[in-house]
Regions:
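Short, Lys/Arg-enriched N-terminal segments with co-localized hydrophobic residues
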Residues: 1-9
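Conserved class I S-adenosyl-L-methionine
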Residues: 10-54, 68-72, 92, 152-180
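Class I SAM-dependent methyltransferase SAM/SAH-binding core
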Residues: 60-62, 66-113
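A short acidic, Gly/Pro-enriched loop at the edge of an enzyme's catalytic core
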Residues: 112-123
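A short SAM/SAH-binding and catalytic strip from SAM-dependent methyltransferases
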Residues: 123-136
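A short glycine-rich, Lys/Arg-flanked "PGG" loop and its adjoining helix->strand segment in the class I
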Residues: 137-152
Length: 180
């Protein structure tokens, strides 16, 4: 594969991923709205375990989807930029941020090719993203490039289809993701 065709392949795959999430955006947004109503304290406790949140912390939310983490961290006084490759997810995120009276900067961007300057963010957070990536190593290189010296990365992720592959795992009630 030459470099040109490799780039075309990645763009095609990214577009397929974006199409998938565009189709699921409204339902996924409803789930996130419910989380904003019911689970904020749980998520803040988890985040505080790893990262000391303070006002004006510059945060990058990778694969922000409908904006759950972006909104949650904006409510804490952080300056949040949320990125996603799905136009519909970004529209849901903007709507949800407005409904929650917070300002967050949302941008369309590939997490594997970030357009931010080096050392732009104090904290990078991502949830349910890296397990989907074709080139996670490239994404991690980009994350570390945009993180400030002594910055923090919190990657909340898992293999969400493992229960389909391991029947003992499924029988033990691990298909609901609460144990992750």
């Amino acid at each position: 594969i030459n470099l040109l065709s490799k780039g075309v392949f990645m763009t095609t795959k990214l577009n397929k991923i974006a199409d998938y999430w565009n189709q699921r955006s409204s339902g996924y947004s409803l789930d996130n709205q419910e989380e904003l109503l019911n689970d904020q304290e749980k998520w803040l406790k988890l985040i505080h375990t790893y990262v000391p949140l303070k006002k004006d912390l510059k945060v990058l939310d990778l694969g922000c989807g409908p904006g759950f983490l972006s909104i949650l961290l904006s409510k804490q006084g952080c300056q949040v930029t949320g990125i996603d490759y799905s136009n519909q997810m970004l529209e849901e995120a903007k709507h949800n941020a407005k409904e929650n009276n917070v300002h967050t900067d949302f941008k369309k961007m590939d997490v594997q090719e970030l357009t931010f300057d080096d050392e732009s963010f104090d904290f990078v957070i991502t949830r349910n993203v890296t397990w989907n990536l074709e080139k996670p190593k490239q994404a991690y290189q980009e994350i570390y490039r945009v993180l400030k010296n002594k910055g923090h990365l919190l990657n909340i992720d898992g293999n969400h289809y493992y229960h389909y592959q391991d029947h003992d795992y499924q029988r033990n009630g691990h298909s609901d993701h609460q144990h992750m």
